[in-house]
From Swiss-Prot:
Keywords: Carboxypeptidase, Cell membrane, Disulfide bond, Glycoprotein, GPI-anchor, Hydrolase, Lipoprotein, Membrane, Protease, Signal, Virulence. This is Carboxypeptidase S1 homolog A. Residues 618-628 have a biased composition (Low complexity). It is a lipid-anchor; GPI-anchor. It catalyses: Preferential release of a C-terminal arginine or lysine residue.
């Protein structure tokens, strides 16, 4: 084994994105005990790890909820220690609104959004230093990044010794009573969560119940946030297409119960004044979005053809056949309505029916796309995709960073326990009580702004499906929204960043030249859209006050499909040790496993990878690469024993 001098041989790296050895002892944290419950507390630490703007404060910490409670309406017998990272606004934080940011998964850390998309800093390719992000979303808004549900990212239930395989991207519980095992590039050690699938929320609605309790504690008792503006927004991404509508509608329902005195328990009566729900490339409802998985790989604005028209037509037929995807989704939803109406996922029969529906839909929707060897999150990129750069994983591996954060656990970008728990009950196949599109309609009727924002190169939660969701809502503004045309999103005097359909508080935006993580591709465009929505301006120009003009509607074309895009150059390949399964070739994976890889700052320098083939178009043939594809897919699928759709679709 050869390691570059920049990585100490004695300090391994850990986690599905994680840390150099065990975390250092936690010191210097402030402890705030709840005035409502002696068993609840907040621990936190102020630091300048990412936000280095003079005078702008940031804090990392945990909200600790004890076991033996019925927070979810079902007995919860595990500790919940939910991690947060709070950044004050760079401009007038006392009067700035606040937005929560949640990545999806289920099981993905919100550090993905913070460091790859919209946080105050970018991580440089040395995985050690940072560069200021001038398009950070905390320019004018207080930002609260949360790792949820329990066991995601820096959140944990109980501190547990673990090993991590960089080859398979898997975490295993370890017994170190006889000593810590030898470590190398492929096998690392650290401290994580218990990895018990039952020690976390097991579905979207239970996650909503959990995050509401977190919010009750944080917004009432975190002493460093005392704003004059008490409005709260939720922005989210990917599987957040389910999180966002469910969480926001649950918050709104709880607000109503507090107002009518249905909720009277001390410490749980803080009204969370919802302002905006923003969803970026959200997978919201498979009933609305399923056909887009067949259509988008063949028919998109880049001229990329992952497969033929005949294959597309066959997929459509398969999902509509008797006892196919749509039939099984309908059966799942009917069973859930009868057997688990409040979405606790405690009915084994319902869980099995919905898990089968999820698996069947995957078979016909996802598997044909795998053969094209294209990026799930960017169809113009190869399957082994180095963008957005994964350097934050090495950054969060540093002992000094973990110490400054006050974290007792190593970082992991994805929780296997959460993935297993959600997928085992068929979460993606079923809606919540109102339905996720119904949740959006409910929020709009309640006066909450809702923005759907989609990058136009993402396959996994693509904009064609997102547009169908936007047109399928049933609320009082439905017809007016559908009649609104698409207008240019004017980012600056020389650049149009996308097209938006907007009526009043509801909008759908297609962002040009962006994959799944839109702010990582188009930071200026994303910031403009975010701030215009947050401050009640029209998305197209940012000049009109929507609060004073609630009947505002965009004018323009009925469709955006006439606006075509050029295929960008493929990114230079970068095999990154802490993202090996998604960025490295089979040859590089073998070198990591046998210890012959040359590594510098987590980047495999040798063996080097060659640039992949350009994506197939209408004038070329698909270039399938089953070997490379299997290198990406084998670990998560084998590890979770679940469908490729549920593993890959929502890693972010």
């Amino acid at each position: 084994m050869r390691l570059a001098a920049s990585i100490a041989v004695a300090l391994p790296v850990i986690g599905a994105a994680s840390a150099q050895g065990f975390p250092p002892p936690v010191t210097g944290v402030t402890v705030v005990k709840s005035k409502y419950d002696e068993n609840v507390k907040i621990t936190y630490k102020e630091n300048d790890i990412c936000e280095t703007t003079e005078g702008v404060r940031s804090f990392t910490g945990h909200v600790h909820l004890p076991p033996d409670n019925d927070y979810f309406g079902v007995y919860q017998n595990y500790s919940i220690n939910t991690f947060f990272w709070f950044f004050e606004a760079r401009e007038d934080p006392k009067n700035a609104p606040l937005s929560i940011w949640l990545n999806g998964g289920p099981g993905s850390s919100s550090m993905i959004g913070l460091f790859q998309e919209n946080g105050p800093c970018w991580i440089n390719d040395d995985s050690k230093s940072t560069t200021n992000n001038s398009f950070s979303w905390n320019n004018r808004v207080n930002m609260l990044y949360i790792d949820q549900p329990n066991q995601v990212g820096f959140s944990y239930d109980e501190l547990t010794n673990i090993t991590y395989s960089t080859i398979n991207d898997t975490i295993s519980v370890a017994d170190f009573s006889s000593g810590v095992p030898a470590q190398n590039l492929s096998t690392l050690v650290g401290t994580g969560s218990s990895q018990k699938p039952w020690a976390t929320a097991n579905n979207t609605v239970n996650a909503a119940r959990s995050i509401w309790h977190f919010a009750q504690v944080w917004f009432q008792e975190f002493p460093e946030h005392k704003p004059n503006n008490n409005k709260i927004s939720i922005w989210t991404e990917s599987y957040g297409g389910r999180y966002g509508p469910s969480f926001a509608s649950y918050f709104q329902e709880q607000n109503e119960k507090i107002k009518n005195h249905t909720i009277t328990k001390e410490g749980e009566m803080h009204i969370l004044n919802l302002d905006t729900l923003g969803v970026i490339n959200g997978c919201i409802d498979l009933m609305f979005q399923a056909e887009s998985y067949a259509e988008f790989p063949y028919n998109n604005t880049y001229g990329i053809t992952a497969y033929t028209k005949e294959k597309r037509d066959a997929i459509i037929r398969d999902i509509h056949r008797p006892d196919g995807c749509f039939d099984k989704l309908a059966k799942c939803r009917e069973a859930a309505k009868e057997g688990d109406p409040h979405f606790y996922s405690n009915n084994a029969t319902v869980n099995a029916i919905c898990a089968e529906a999820n698996s069947d839909c995957d078979k016909y929707l996802m598997e044909p796309f795998q053969e094209a060897n294209l990026g799930y999150y960017d169809i113009a990129h190869p399957l082994q995709d180095p963008f957005p750069p994964p350097f934050f994983k090495g950054f969060l591996s540093q002992s000094s960073v973990l110490s400054d954060m006050g974290s007792p656990v190593n970082f992991s970008h994805y929780s296997q326990a959460v993935g297993k728990s959600f997928h085992g009950v068929g979460d993606y196949a079923r809606p919540d009580v109102r339905g996720f599109t119904g949740d959006i309609a409910y929020l709009l009727e309640s006066g909450v702004k809702v923005a759907l924002v989609y990058g136009d190169r993402d396959y996994i939660c693509n904009w064609l499906g997102g547009e169908q969701v936007s047109l399928g809502l049933n609320y009082t503004g439905t017809e007016a929204f559908r009649k609104a045309g698409y207008a240019d999103v004017k980012v600056n005097s020389s650049y149009v960043g996308g097209l938006v359909r907007q009526h009043g508080n509801f909008s759908f935006t297609r962002v040009f030249e962006a994959g799944h993580e839109v702010p990582g591709y188009q930071p200026e465009t994303s910031l403009k859209i975010f701030e215009r929505i947050m401050f009640n301006k029209d998305i197209a120009t940012g000049e009109l006050d929507i609060a004073q003009k609630q009947d505002y509607g965009t004018t323009g074309t009925e469709s955006t499909f006439q606006v075509k895009n050029e295929i960008p150059p493929s990114p230079e390949p970068t095999c990154y040790l802490l993202s090996a399964d998604g960025t490295c070739t089979p040859e590089q994976l073998n070198a990591i496993e046998n210890g012959t890889a040359v590594v510098e700052n987590y980047i495999i320098k040798s063996p080097a990878a060659s640039k992949g083939n350009p994506p197939p178009t209408t004038t070329s043939s698909p270039t399938a690469s089953p070997t490379a594809g299997s290198a990406m897919l084998k670990a998560p699928v084998a590890m979770l024993a679940i469908s490729a759709l549920t593993v890959l679709a929502f890693y972010l």
